[in-house]
């Protein structure tokens, strides 16, 4: 069994599509109707965006994570995000390097690198 996709309820599909395309390289895979789109990330995973009213507090109940090869890549992402006006926190728990940002609906999204071996 393979985890195939995650669906987010968002207030504006267009704004969320632009965010995930710009910052994480996702491209449109399916766009069947207004208010719904499926984006594909380079490794094949899917992110479905469905327009609606996100549940109160739902943005803080989970996060999305994108792995990059090195901690330098995490720092580069953080610096690029900050240069474009996003708040980007950096953490280093247990040898990980993690940069966290929020999407247009406040969902937490992290870019991380595994601890060096």
Regions found by a protein language model. Name each.
Residues 1-14, 64, 115-117:
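N-terminal beta-strand motif that seeds the catalytic metal site of vicinal oxygen chelate
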Residues 1-2, 57-61, 92-93:
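Short glycine-enriched loop/turn motifs at secondary-structure junctions
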Residues 5-7, 38, 63-65, 98-100:
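Short aromatic/hydrophobic contact patches that present stacked aromatics
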Residues 12-27:
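Amphipathic alpha-helical segments
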Residues 15-18, 72-76:
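Short, conserved charged micro-motifs
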Residues 26-27, 48, 85-90:
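A short linear hydrophobic-aromatic micro-motif
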Residues 27-60, 108-114:
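Conserved short beta-strand elements that form part of the metal-binding/catalytic scaffold
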Residues 78-79, 83-117:
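Vicinal oxygen chelate
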